[in-house]
Structure formats: structure tokens, C-alpha cells
Amino acid sequence: MILKYDDIPLVHLPAFKGGEKELAANMFFDGTNRIFRGRLVPGASIGVHTHEDSCEVINVVSGMGVLLEEGMEHEVTAGDCFYCPKGGTHSLRNPSDAQEDLLFLATVCQC
């Protein structure tokens, strides 16, 4: 199956997972798994959450972000990939002093 993000409706998810501002995403959902292109403007974030029954892969396309993984912060930039295993806890934010949007691709699979 080929997915074209530009053909998937853009959704705006305010305070996603308890984060700041909103996550804008072109999100495909097959009833079990999610594949999406996400955008966080400066100051926006995805709140801290745990993947109880899923795992997630995030690939940073452009911009800079701060990833919180199990209580430790890591700077992520274009070309970085993050894997959150089942049971893992994380969040992602675009620092408010950032000059550009944080664009990323993510896949959340049930495992």
C-alpha cells in the first residue's frame, strides 16, 4: 500500500497527550496501527505518555526538537530516528525559541 501524506486529511489535535499548543498531522489509521506526518510549531509539544500496548518509531525530517525518553532529554534534528518500545515513556517538543517547525514521520504499531 502506498500512502501519500498530501492525500490524507490534515487534522489538528490540540494539547495532544497533554502537550502544549497542537499537533498538526496527516494521519492514516487502519484500525490497529497509525502512520503519520506530524508538525509541531515552535512552543508546541506532544505530552508525556507511555506506550502500554504499542511501540513507536519517529523519524525527524526537518527542524529541531527535544525528546524526553524515560526522564532524559535528547536533542533531535533532521535525520534522527527514535524508537520507543512497548512499555516505554516519551514526549516530543519544539522548543519555544526554535526558528522553524519540527516535521517528523511516525509509525505506531500494536505489539
Task: Identify the residue ranges that each predicted region occupies.
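Glycine- and acidic-residue-biased ligand/ion/polar-headgroup-sensing regions
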Residues: D53-G65
